[in-house]
Amino acid sequence: MASAVVNQSEAAAVRAPSKPVKTYSKENEQLVKQSWEILKKDAQRNGINFFRKVFEIAPGAKAMYSFLRDSTIPFEENPKVKNHARYVFMMTGDAAVQLGEKGAYQVLESKLQKLAATHVNAGVTDDQFEIVKEAILYAIEMGVPDLWSPELKSAWGDAYDMLAEQVKAEMHAQRSAATS
């Protein structure tokens, strides 16, 4: 994988300015934080729900995960799926709760280049981020059904959009650097 990763200084040199940042209100911040306190207690189950929904919407996405391609282990029993699902769900939630304090770029900065490179190498496209958004909102709804509301959906949707825009911008920068 290291050979496929773009020289980071080249990517930084061509990084396009990100789109205008959505406003992340105090109300949204509170809704996300309140629900995250509950969601993170069962991050593995919520992460499994998230990935189950991704693969329901886009069954071909399984091919992007080396640990699923040739596995005969049932999805929900696969220890690699469990670990990855928990990691992705925790990273997304932990980043979302920090948005009000730091902004999307600062929240992701330390992980952004590696995260983008992983997605570039897997062949992820911008439109696939919408599938992930639908799946993460589904997992949150399943994880906190008593709190779920249009306002909570909007708060998490805005948080996801802000984070996804930063990842996509870095992916574009890395792809541009690789072709120049």
Curated annotation (Swiss-Prot):
User: So where does this one cross the membrane?
Assistant: none
Subcellular location(s) per record:
Cytoplasm; Nucleus
Q: How is the cofactor bound?
A: Binds 1 heme group per subunit.
Domain Globin positions: 23-172
Residues the record annotates as the site (Homodimerization) are 153
Catalysed reaction, written as an equation: Fe(III)-heme b-[protein] + nitric oxide + H2O = Fe(II)-heme b-[protein] + nitrite + 2 H(+)
At which positions is heme b bound? 66, 80, 84, 114, 118-119
Q: Report the residue ranges where the short sequence motif Homodimerization is annotated in this entry.
A: 56-60, 126-138
> What cofactor(s) does the depicted protein rely on?
heme b
Query: Which GO molecular function annotations are given, in alphabetical order?
Result: heme binding; metal ion binding; oxidoreductase activity; oxygen binding; oxygen carrier activity
Identify the EC number(s). Answer: 1.7.2.-
Keywords annotated in UniProt: Cytoplasm, Heme, Iron, Metal-binding, Nucleus, Oxidoreductase, Oxygen transport, Transport
Q: What family is this protein classified in?
A: Belongs to the plant globin family.
User: What does the subunit section of this Swiss-Prot or TrEMBL entry state?
Assistant: Homodimer.
**What protein name is recorded for this chain?**
Anaerobic nitrite reductase GLB0
**Species annotation:** Physcomitrium patens
